[in-house]
Every structure is written in C-alpha cells, then in structure tokens.
UniProtKB/Swiss-Prot annotation:
Family label: Belongs to the eukaryotic ribosomal protein eS17 family.
GO annotation, cellular component aspect: cytosol; ribonucleoprotein complex; ribosome
GO molecular function: structural constituent of ribosome
Superkingdom of the source species: Archaea
GO terms under biological process: translation
PROSITE patterns per the UniProt record, alphabetical: RIBOSOMAL_S17E
InterPro entries linked: Ribosomal_eS17 (IPR001210), Ribosomal_eS17_CS (IPR018273), Ribosomal_eS17_sf (IPR036401)
Protein name, per record: Small ribosomal subunit protein eS17
Length: 65
C-alpha cells in the first residue's frame, strides 16, 4: 500500500481543480508546470505531490469538467 496524502496537499489540489477544472489533464509533467504557474508554492516536493494528486484525480475521473 502507498502512503496517504497529507490534508494540505488535498486542499490545494481540490481548490485548483475547482478554479481551473478544464486546464488540468492526465499528464503529470503538464500538471506540474501548471501548478508552478498557478500557485506560489516554493517547495519542489510539495509542488510535485500536488501535481501528482491532481493527475490521479483526473485519470480516475473524479473531476467535473
């Protein structure tokens, strides 16, 4: 089993998906770039975790586009 994502990662990702549902795709690298542009997150690790969580939600169809 994998680890559970921290709540702050989920909150940031859900807010981004709520504001920009049509922007994000199932491509991690593209989402990583978008998260960097749309937020002021300085930490590379946090940025990647947010992008990964968004990618997972999009690929699983948990986003209302």
């Amino acid at each position: 089993m994998g680890t559970v994502k921290p709540a702050y990662i989920k909150v940031i990702a859900r807010e981004l998906l709520k504001k920009y549902p049509e922007v994000f795709t199932g491509n991690f690298d593209e989402n990583k770039r978008l998260v960097a542009e749309l937020t002021n997150i300085q930490s590379k690790t946090v940025r990647n975790r947010v992008a990964g969580y968004i990618t997972r939600r999009v690929n699983r169809g948990l986003v209302n586009v």
